[in-house]
């Protein structure tokens, strides 16, 4: 096996993992020192062996210092799995300057050329609190299943955005990364979830599911991030099924709005299409909307994916999100999100047969209490 890389001193990157020779695993990358990147994982053996795991990025140290990026996972040779990417480091908090950004997650390594799964992408680091919030790091791309047989790696999740203690805006949350493509035979990897938005901040969108190549199902899309006092983020699209056989992946659900009187639920991701034989993926559900002074709307559901050209049903549309409950006098509840459209039927099938079902609309939010001003007349008072 290749040797492991050393950890970096403060502010210094971690060392790369050593490659294997003919048979053996690649070494792991070393962790980055404060605010520095992690080292890359070593390459797996050319005949057999897994790629090494990437090192984690170092957390920021000192007011407003960003976290380091995660190291990339090492690729496999002929037979073996790719190494996972390292996680990004968290940013450092601050008072009179902006909080530090979270580091990016490292990409997963590719699977073996004959057999092996791709490595998972690392997760993004969390943005820090400051006068302006730090941005959350994006997740790392999932590694591809490159060979005859292998599943794509899952995409990394986005990091949470940092909150703010002053007029500048909160930090934007990190995006979920796309899942890796499947090998000649194998499923696509799932997309990563988007990061949660800080209060009033932009939430991260979900990553797309990876596509299958010849035989296999598309990966599911990642969920959109939740937020408060701002919109929920959209879910990621499902990956396409294999060119010969396989279902499309389901779309990720939209992010919810958990508090506040602004913002609507995120849209559900669209389902992936089947190509020749297989069913389309279901659309993701729209995000729900929590209570507000005036009820806001739930998110729309995603459309279903198309059925295969030779055989397969279209995917069902995703249901709409729940509308928000209104509070206070005379306020109106939010509207439920629209359901997604069903996916298309195969072109040769009889009209209407094989199409996906449309998603149901989301429930409407409840209304606020009736006004008590001016006070109502007593029931015993005669009315002229």
Language-model segments: residues:
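Long, compositionally biased tandem-repeat segments
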Residues: 1-384
């Amino acid at each position: 096996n290749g040797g492991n890389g050393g950890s970096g001193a403060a502010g210094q990157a971690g060392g790369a993992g050593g490659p294997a020779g003919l048979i053996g695993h690649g070494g792991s990358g070393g962790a980055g020192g404060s605010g520095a990147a992690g080292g890359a994982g070593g390459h797996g053996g050319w005949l057999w062996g897994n790629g090494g795991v990437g090192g984690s990025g170092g957390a920021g140290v000192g007011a407003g210092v960003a976290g380091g990026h995660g190291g990339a996972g090492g690729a496999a040779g002929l037979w073996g799995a790719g190494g996972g990417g390292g996680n990004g480091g968290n940013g450092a908090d601050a008072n009179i300057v902006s909080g530090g950004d979270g580091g990016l997650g490292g990409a997963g390594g590719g699977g073996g050329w004959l057999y092996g799964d791709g490595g998972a992408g690392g997760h993004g680091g969390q943005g820090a609190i400051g006068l302006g919030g730090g941005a959350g790091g994006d997740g790392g791309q999932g590694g591809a299943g490159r060979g005859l047989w292998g599943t794509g790696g899952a995409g990394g999740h986005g990091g949470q955005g940092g909150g703010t203690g002053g007029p500048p805006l909160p930090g934007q949350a990190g995006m979920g990364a796309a899942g890796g493509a499947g090998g000649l035979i194998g499923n696509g990897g799932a997309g990563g979830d988007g990061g949660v938005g800080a209060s009033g901040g932009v939430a991260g969108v979900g990553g797309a599911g990876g596509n299958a190549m010849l035989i296999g199902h598309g990966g599911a899309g990642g969920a959109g991030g939740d937020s408060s006092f701002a919109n929920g983020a959209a879910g990621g699209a499902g990956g396409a099924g294999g060119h010969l056989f396989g279902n499309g992946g389901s779309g990720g659900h939209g992010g919810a709005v958990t508090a506040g009187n602004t913002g609507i639920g995120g849209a559900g991701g669209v389902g992936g299409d089947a190509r020749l034989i297989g069913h389309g993926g279901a659309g993701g559900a729209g995000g729900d909307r929590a209570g507000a002074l005036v009820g806001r709307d739930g998110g729309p559901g995603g459309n279903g994916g198309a059925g295969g050209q030779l055989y397969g049903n279209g995917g069902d549309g995703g249901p709409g999100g729940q509308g928000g409950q209104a509070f206070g006098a005379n306020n109106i509840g939010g509207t439920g999100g629209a359901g997604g459209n069903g996916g298309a039927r195969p072109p040769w099938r009889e009209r209407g047969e094989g199409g996906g079902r449309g998603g149901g609309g989301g429930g409407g939010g409840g209304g606020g209490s009736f006004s008590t001003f001016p006070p109502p007349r007593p029931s015993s008072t005669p009315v002229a």
